[in-house]
Amino acid sequence: MRGSLNVYLHEVEPIRLGVNRLLDGADPILSAYRAHRITPATAQRRLGRLERRFAAYAVQIAAVAKVPPALRSAQRSYAHTFVLEDAYLSALVAAVPEHDFDDLPDTQARQRAAIIGWRIQLEVLAERRGVDLPADLQAAGRGEIAPSPGGS
């Protein structure tokens, strides 16, 4: 039982941390775009690359196979947050040239709830099995979920 949770964490953690690092890269692009330090075409190109890398993470999280039974529902919800974020990023990329951000999907609340639900289930299972979780896991679901074209 303990081993299956460790296997799961070993598979999910690099994805979670990679996504965090990747999304941290969106704010400097959007900031430079807002300040007119880069053109809309450059911002769109950079955000497009970021979105394509994110899409690869979405595939990876969906492909996680060794999910402990007690986490399966939470894992499906967590993986779905990647679908929502990818849809948001795709819409953001498309909106950049015309600076038309009014119709961006508003999925932050749904994503936050799913991520927090996943984190809570993970914490409960880890406590029951005596498994230590990564120290930064408490931050999951807090803070900004999606890069904001208007700034935070």
Question: Regions from the language model: what does each represent?
Answer:
Residues 53-79, 94-98, 127-133:
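Short, solvent-exposed, charged loop/turn and helix-capping segments
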Residues 1-50, 84-152:
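C-terminal amphipathic alpha-helix
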